[in-house]
UniProtKB/Swiss-Prot annotation:
GO-annotated cellular components: plasma membrane
Protein's recorded name: Uncharacterized protein RP382
Entry's family note: To A.aeolicus AQ_155.
Record keywords, A-Z: Cell membrane, Membrane, Transmembrane, Transmembrane helix
Source organism per UniProt: Rickettsia prowazekii (strain Madrid E)
Membrane topology: Multi-pass membrane protein
Keyword Cell membrane: yes
Length: 510
């Protein structure tokens, strides 16, 4: 039964991971348009400037919202014990009723595999939605295209993920809330459900207001997604902490000494996220204090948990004893010298650790850079997206680490000569190069955005007047963006080729 559960979980997790990779790839294609239109020398290639905002909206939704939530859904499916029997502790006295409940539970597990397919269809609707019209609404967190195709796609994705979360929660093992995995799964599911509570609360409040006074569509969507969008950022942070600690545990090859501390951080971030509900309780949605509450909430509480996590990780590494280092060295030497089966290629563990170290370094660097830039925000200009790009791409690279960690064990299995050509593309050096390229490009892109914002270039407007002094910075931003796109698409290519096309690597449902 346990192996069957594990097969269920791995297959389900990979389905969501595939969706995340697809959405990231599609978002990367749209980002090419954004970079070209933001680069003075290249913007003349696009005569219709409305394409910029449409591309921006689709890019944000595909490469942030759907990508990060797909990784979150993958974590739910991969790490949760999906029980194929009735709930523990429920007494069912009648045999027929017991059979019905058992059959229903099996059926629920089968239904879980429908959700990634529905989400994939929703993602395609979002990707092609610009064909239905360019009526753009550039509100924060979940920017909108006001056409039926986009709204259907976004609604389908949200409802699908909500139903999936409720199903996972139904099958959740409530007796094991003392480990990192289950706390992450439980807390992020509750946070995601609460984000829908916020969306519903905001919608109800706005419906009452528009009956009295008209509201501009951009202001409407800004308020509709403001509270729930803030809560989504805390979900991303929760997943970030989980992945950072998981990657650290992989490279240290031992149980972490500060396990309880990391659990405390996850619970702390969870409690901070729940405080978001007080914005709706304390303020009217039309009141300016409503938006300020969430801005201050993010400003003062959003970075506490990840910073504490980084402190714990640094102390963990510093306090690693010489004995542990010696054991680690012996372990790596033993894996390096182990025999390789005939006609097979095996990726050694020490190289896997090298990739994970690279991912951790790049993720932490970009996340901290985004935090430092946030200190300099004092106007509505390009400093704001510079901060957000740093933080969110730092989280995104951590999610890439989760993806690589999922794929690499498959590559460690026996891979025969017939697939050797694929391994050239999937080699460790290419993986590390993709991550470094993405990070370097993003640093250039972020710094170009930040300094352009300091010189007064406004956000969300490709036609804003660009001072001569910031032309070079905008060019740096464009070049950095293109470099980052290449790195990101390399990631999509490597992971996509492994998960979709490499024979012998599929996890079949048993």
């Amino acid at each position: 039964m346990h192996s069957t559960n594990k097969s269920h979980n791995n297959s389900l997790a990979n389905a969501w991971l595939k969706l995340g990779i697809i959405s990231l790839g599609l978002g990367g294609l749209y980002s090419i348009i954004l970079v070209v239109l933001r680069t003075p020398q290249l913007s003349s290639f696009f005569l219709n400037q409305r394409i910029f905002k449409s591309a921006l909206i689709i890019h944000v939704n595909l490469s942030i919202l759907i990508w990060l939530l797909s990784i979150t859904a993958s974590v739910w499916g991969n790490e949760t014990s999906l029980r194929l029997v009735k709930r523990r502790g429920i007494f069912i006295p009648f045999g027929l009723l017991r059979e019905i409940v058992t059959f229903y539970t099996f059926d629920r597990n089968d239904v879980l595999y429908i959700y990634p397919k529905l989400a994939f269809f929703a993602t395609l609707l979002i990707a092609i939605s610009p064909l239905a019209g360019y009526n753009t609404v550039t509100n924060n967190y979940i920017p909108m295209l006001a056409n039926i195709v986009f709204i259907l796609g976004l609604s389908l994705f949200g409802v699908t993920l909500l139903l999936y979360a409720i199903n996972i929660l139904y099958l959740f093992d409530w007796m094991k809330l003392n480990n990192l995995v289950n706390v992450t799964v439980f807390s992020t599911i509750i946070m995601f459900i609460l984000s829908f509570v916020c969306f519903g609360w905001s919608y109800k409040s706005l419906q009452k207001i528009i009956q009295i006074i008209p509201i501009e569509i951009e202001f409407y969507y800004e308020l509709l997604f403001w509270s729930g969008g803030h809560l989504l950022q805390f979900i991303y942070t929760q997943i970030l902490i989980f992945i950072w600690v998981s990657l650290l545990r992989t490279i240290t090859v031992r149980e972490l000494k500060f396990q309880t501390f990391y659990l405390f951080i996850l619970y702390l971030n969870f409690v901070f996220s729940i405080l978001i509900l007080f914005g709706h309780i304390s303020y009217d949605i039309i009141d300016i204090a409503f938006k300020e509450f969430y801005t201050d909430h993010m400003k003062y509480l959003g970075g506490i948990a990840p910073i504490l996590c980084l402190v714990g990780m640094v102390v963990e590494l510093v306090l690693m004893s010489y004995r542990d280092k010696l054991v680690l060295l012996i372990y790596r030497l033993s894996t390096k010298s182990s025999k390789i089966k005939k006609d097979c290629i095996t990726l050694s563990n020490h190289r896997t650790h090298s990739i994970i170290k690279t991912i951790l370094l790049c993720s932490i660097t970009l996340f901290l850079l985004g935090g430092l830039i946030a200190i300099n925000i004092n106007d509505i200009n390009l400093v704001i997206p510079a901060h957000y790009h740093g933080s969110i791409v730092g989280i995104s690279i951590a999610c890439m680490g989760y993806s690589y960690q999922t794929i690499i064990p498959l590559m460690d299995h026996d891979i025969h000569k017939t697939t050797k050509q694929y391994l050239i593309t999937l080699s460790i050096n290419w993986i590390k190069f993709a991550i470094y390229l993405l990070t370097f490009g993003q640093i250039l892109h972020i710094l170009g955005l930040a300094f352009s914002g300091i010189y007064g270039v406004m956000r969300k407007d490709p036609n804003s007047i660009v001072p001569m002094s910031s032309k070079l910075l905008m060019g740096m931003m464009g070049i950095g963006g293109l470099i980052a796109i290449v790195g990101g698409l390399m990631f999509v290519y490597i992971c996509g080729k492994t998960m979709f096309f490499l024979k012998g690597m599929k996890l079949e449902y048993e």
